[in-house]
Amino acid sequence: MGIILSGSPSSVNVENAPDVDIQFLIQHVPVFGICYGAQLTAKIFGGRVDKSEKREYGRALFEVKKEDILLKDISPTSQVWMSHADTIIKLPDEFELLGTTESIPVAAFKRNSNGNCSLYGLQFHPEVYHSTEGKTIIKNFLTN
């Protein structure tokens, strides 16, 4: 069981941006941030999210940088679907980079806390048909 924080047309950097108490959530259940949800978690923990040089919408090639249970059975490179105007530029110190694309430095990450991962984030949309291995990633989150 876990909670998925989805995408949003909003920016995490605007006043009154949608927010959630992630610190509370991760004490009780694993959290999986997708797009806006990933940007929000990175920002809350001290990362940096900036406006993208250009809005990214469409297919991208995801490259696994570090093996992890979230990316179990995922090819070293796979097609993913991007739809975002902001980009995670810098991860918080306790976060680990799991994957990138050609155009963004942070496409997948996790936060380690006492050896347990209770927080994952993806800049891309695994739930979209064009993310060819997205269903596997979601399954990995829900079953591990």
Model region roles, listed by residue range:
Residues 22, 26, 39-79, 85, ...:
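A conserved active-site-flanking secondary-structure segment within enzyme catalytic domains
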Residues 30-32, 96, 118:
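Proline-centered loop/turn at the N-terminus of a beta-strand
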Residues 104-116:
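Short, surface-exposed beta-strand/loop micro-motifs that present aromatic residues
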